[in-house]
Amino acid sequence: MIVIADDITGAAEIAGIAFSEGHQVSLVCGSSACCDIVAAQTTVIATDTRSMTEAEAIAESHRIASHLSPLTTYLFKKTDSALRGHVVAELTALMEATGYQRAVYLPANPSKGRIIKNGRYYINNVPIHETDFSFDPEFPAKTSVLRERFPDAEAKGIIMPDAESEENIRRLIAEYNDGKTLFAGAADLFSALLNVNHGDAYHGDRPSDSSLRLANHGVSPHDTLILCGSTQSKSLDLGIPIAPMPREIYDGNDDLSLWDTSEYAKIHSLILTMPFTHRTGKKAAVHLRSMMAQKTKELITQHQPSHLIIEGGATAWATLQTLGWTQFKIVAQIAPGVVQMSATIACHTSTCGSKKRVIVTLKPGSYPWGDLFSSSADT
């Protein structure tokens, strides 16, 4: 199975699901996404199309699809579970490039209280446009009605069914899984498809819950850098200094010297936050993630931490691209969507040798942290 994800945390989430099921999984991102794709049961291609313009997202979708092997037997499009992104444009481009006759778009995640009922999207029984997703800087939720959010979807062959339970999802797969339909959506749909299409393909032992917990690289208060770069971010009380982005930078100033991060030099740990939500739009979003990424690079130039934790897909992509970190090995799934990856990167600071192994933990902004910050984590 090949998966194309529209942001890096979504890609990591899907890779983590496949990993936890014991599947051989490859995760590629950035410019490497169109290089030779490793022959694995599941290959996840991370893109940043959600943060691109619609025209750029269409071009990137065509580019990636054109590099897929003719032997690709199954393609899944990972989309956001909160209706964000250039969904119709990207699905249309993928159908044109691959020959799929129609698409089933199912962003519902019933396991997380995210359902579609009578054509409306709810999060824990609250219409999505009444949640914090209405503050998203690029794709603010203005309606909970899918046909209003994507008015041209059905005309382009994109089906948007209801789903209130995981059983509903399994029934939809049984109805549409004919080899002519491109499935697109969130993690619950992928998990169900994985079981249907590859349930008998793996012949080893799936990792147990306890082994996954033991793999958790917990949070040390002495060598950890945490980026809270999502409008869904919640405050963290970890005994680590917090450095909020100043209002001047948030409002458009690009002078990073205004951002006081002096505590990092003392204990080599820090939490960077964005405490404001009043700016929306593409320009604001690009500025905010760029500032977060540049400040992170500045800090890592001072000291390369053992653990980098990033909340928010756009922030994660911008940061890892700015750092030049593009190749990772998945080492643990802490909770749904909370995935840890290992990277061995060149180290140019005075505090480490020529290379250093860094654990990178990624999490979508709206997902819970699981037991990452639990006292039982291996620190």
Placement of each model-derived feature along the sequence:
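Cap/lid and interdomain-hinge subdomains that line or gate substrate/regulatory clefts
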Residues: 1-2, 20, 24-32, 41, ...
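General beta-strand structural signal in soluble alpha/beta enzymes
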Residues: 3-5, 26-28, 75-78, 102-107, ...
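Gly/Ser/Thr-rich loops at beta-strand to alpha-helix junctions
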Residues: 7-10, 79-88, 110-112, 165-167, ...
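N-terminal short beta-loop-beta anion/metal-coordinating cradle
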Residues: 20-42, 255-266, 330-352
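Conserved, well-structured core segments that form the ligand-binding/active-site neighborhood
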Residues: 120-203, 209, 213-214, 219-260
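A glycine- and small/hydrophobic-rich beta-loop-beta segment
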Residues: 228-300
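Active-site beta-strand/loop microenvironment that shapes enzyme catalytic pockets
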Residues: 299-327
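Conserved, well-ordered active-site substructure
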Residues: 316-372
